[in-house]
């Protein structure tokens, strides 16, 4: 039996927009055009992507480090930006910057990787720019992950898995920005893996979904 849990929440009022649409688009275009493809077999483009991300993090005033992801075909790198206190609990927000490839009719093809996941990286870099204007009281770590897509998906060789295994500070909250760039307001544009979910959730793909483990106990600050 499958049970769907629909939390009782109220919509929050709109807040002023501070992120730059122009910068979001600039990042997506750079990743999907200038350094395309960003698949595992295109290490030069992945390294150029990592350098671009690193430069934005540095310009935001973060403490920036590169973390080696020691897997075959590398070197792949996670780019880590720290804000706020250097010890104590962490809030981690991450997004992978590689893109997928596949074989179609025995031909290797590369996805542009715009929604998956240049959009997540663009959001991550805008968070970096916004954090430049803040002084967080809790440590915040922004991480651009390498090696999320196959052949590394769901393995210990994922960049996110390597990063998680290296953490020594307690993690209060982790948010992964994944495919946040696609929008469709047409009726029926949103479907779900289980038909019953359509009874609980909108039929238009004009929202960003927040999914989490139901047992999460950390309170969220609005």
Annotate the PLM regions:
Residues 1-4:
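Hydrophobic membrane-insertion alpha-helices, especially the h-region
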Residues 11-12, 27-39, 144, 201-207:
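Acidic/histidine-rich, surface-exposed loop or edge segments in extracytoplasmic proteins
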Residues 17-24, 39-50, 74, 90, ...:
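Solvent-exposed, acidic/flexible segments
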Residues 23-26, 30, 44, 48-59, ...:
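Extracytoplasmic/secreted proteins, especially bacterial periplasmic and envelope-associated proteins
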Residues 29-88:
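A non-catalytic alpha/beta surface segment that caps or lines the substrate-entry region
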Residues 30, 78-82, 90-96, 139-145, ...:
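Soluble periplasmic/extracytoplasmic beta-strand elements of cell-envelope proteins
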Residues 70-72, 85-87, 97-101, 147-151, ...:
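Solvent-exposed loop/turn segments at secondary-structure junctions
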Residues 109-215:
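Acidic/histidine-rich catalytic neighborhood of metal-dependent amide-processing enzymes
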